Amino acid sequence: MNVLIIGSGGREHALGWKAAQNPNVETIFVAPGNAGTALEPKLENVNIAVEDIAGLVAFAKEKAIELTIVGPEVPLVLGVVDAFYEAGLPIFGPTQAAAQLEGSKAFTKDFLARHQIPTAAYANFTDIEPALAYVREQGAPIVVKADGLAAGKGVIVAMTLEEAEEAIKDMLAGNAFGEAGSRVVIEEFLDGEEASFIVMVDGENVLPMATSQDHKRVGDKDTGPNTGGMGAYSPAPVVTPEIHNRVMQEVIFPTVRGMAAEGNPYTGFLYAGLMIDKDGTPKVIEYNCRFGDPETQPIMMRMESDLVELCLAAIDKKLDQVESKWDPRASIGIVLAAGGYPAAYNKGDVISGLPQVEIEGEKVFHAGTENKEGDIVTNGGRVLCATALGNSVSEAQQRAYELAKQIRWEGMFHRNDIGYRAIAREQQK
């Protein structure tokens, strides 16, 4: 069978690498892919942009694609799933209406309130003055979010009133995030530990993936601006079996039931970004309608089930008949980024030291890379993700940093403490 994966990041490289392990899969086309997917056995890049919905549909028809997996959020919010359904093509992802869970933060907060799903107290604004008045009344720290898609960067955690006021003015008047910021959500600052809780949904049944924890801030010890994610590990020890159960009962099931009841049944990967407070109460910070990046990379390293079979079962509404199996080892992925990221950065720098031979339990997933005249060069802010398995998070971390150490380009940087919370827990034991 032929498979299509939409996207060009580290997440799509990891999904493609995992899907290629299915013996019935002949070719996995990645649109548009990157330099890493181009080199992967069974994978083939196709020069179609993720926003080119008509082009993707035409290609899937031409190649008789039997499964399409959508990586990023943009095509989902543009309605790629609806277009594939109309053409009678099998695709795993939420419809345009269901993808509002990620596409609009205001929609999501109102949905959570309607279904009594735990989240931070909030208010939505389109005008500056009422927004400023609300912030002054609430005080800092407080969180200001652009309503629409902003590539993971439209969230400002304001520690002072000045920062909050500046963020509101930037978004509502300065148009810092364009259309995405024409409405803002202001919400209470939640204290606790974050976790990424990702599940597969077929409309009603839910299959949990392994838990993970992302590191959003650009700098060590969680300093500096938010990014799309600087590294992740799986499993996340903060999600104990009791908390896992609470998340399923209090967050995931009510979300899936609520979407179905409102006429937007949800199919696809559903990612709940959670804050878990000291009492173990999970609250929803955000939803994503897709697998996280970089969480996909360590999670796929641990997945022992067949990803293609799971996606096909979900499309057939048979997720209750399959199970997911996981490597008991921990996995960690460290993002290697271009100097300047998440602000302006260089492209086109030649990357050296990429591993020529793959070692079991180690993998460099490509994100912002391209092939230029035989050289692999940088082509994005997050360039690579050095990923490794280990018997503990400490061991996985050591292996991943060893792997990262061999790779070089002008201006490359990474965080040096990915996994620090889990390692602190391991040391306490």
From Swiss-Prot:
Reaction catalyzed: 5-phospho-beta-D-ribosylamine + glycine + ATP = N(1)-(5-phospho-beta-D-ribosyl)glycinamide + ADP + phosphate + H(+)
Q: Where is the stretch described as Disordered?
A: 212-234
Q: Which residues bind Mg(2+) per the record?
A: 286, 288
Q: Where is ATP bound in this sequence?
A: 135-196
Q: Which InterPro entries is this protein grouped with?
A: ATP-grasp, ATP_grasp_subdomain_1, PreATP-grasp_dom_sf, PRibGlycinamid_synth_ATP-grasp, PRibGlycinamide_synth, PRibGlycinamide_synth_C-dom, PRibGlycinamide_synth_C_sf, PRibGlycinamide_synth_CS
Q: Magnesium: present as a keyword of the record?
A: yes
Explain how, and how many, cofactor molecules are bound.
Answer: Binds 1 Mg(2+) or Mn(2+) ion per subunit.
- List the PROSITE patterns hit by this protein, alphabetically: ATP_GRASP, GARS
Under Pfam families, the record lists: GARS_A, GARS_C, GARS_N
The protein's Enzyme Commission number: 6.3.4.13
> What is the enzyme's class at the highest EC level?
ligase
Biological process, per Gene Ontology: 'de novo' IMP biosynthetic process; purine nucleobase biosynthetic process
**Stated family:** Belongs to the GARS family.
- What protein does this entry describe? Phosphoribosylamine--glycine ligase
Species: Vibrio vulnificus (strain CMCP6)
